[in-house]
Amino acid sequence: MYYLKNTNFWMFGLFFFFYFFIMGAYFPFFPIWLHDINHISKSDTGIIFAAISLFSLLFQPLFGLLSDKLGLRKYLLWIITGMLVMFAPFFIFIFGPLLQYNILVGSIVGGIYLGFCFNAGAPAVEAFIEKVSRRSNFEYGRARMFGCVGWALCASIVGIMFTINNQFVFWLGSGCAFILAVLLFFAKTDAPSSATVANAVGANHSAFSLKLAL
């Protein structure tokens, strides 16, 4: 039970919990939001999901490369967290109105945001925390379990909230994102001194090239 005294175990376990809590507010209810709230047809729904998949495919290799380059630095997670803070304003004031204005424009904008934050963002978050688990000596699977609990709990809560007012769901997601920011701020991922020296002299970095990116 040594991991219970590990601060990073709790920090990133809770990060998983709230990140997947937000995902649980998005994935199961997104088709319902499109059809019942925005009255999007099935064919247009297909366009939206195709755009999300397209941008996910574009972002995932980039995130993989950035994750390797950044190591234990939290820059990418800060960007993802910052975008998740805008979860409610994006859905309520940007994505929904854009879908009513022009389905293609709305699909592109939604594909970029959702592909970045979730479809490509989730693997980047998991890869980062896996690195932290090795650095901080806690089992990744135990921290990842927090995410499963967060998703399951959210599905129960959001299902009730959605029937009352669908906007509550998005504001709940933004509130959870603020908690992510607090957790990320206090989490310590400093590399050990030997690794820091190796990074400083470039021993742990390969030269960037187009071949590497592809």
Task: Pin down the residues of each PLM region.
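Cytoplasmic membrane-interface "Motif A"-like loop-to-helix N-cap segments
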Residues: 68-82
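Hydrophobic core of transmembrane alpha-helices in multi-pass small-molecule transporters
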Residues: 17, 87, 99-124, 128
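Helix-to-loop junctions at the C-terminal end of transmembrane segments
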Residues: 58-72, 161-163
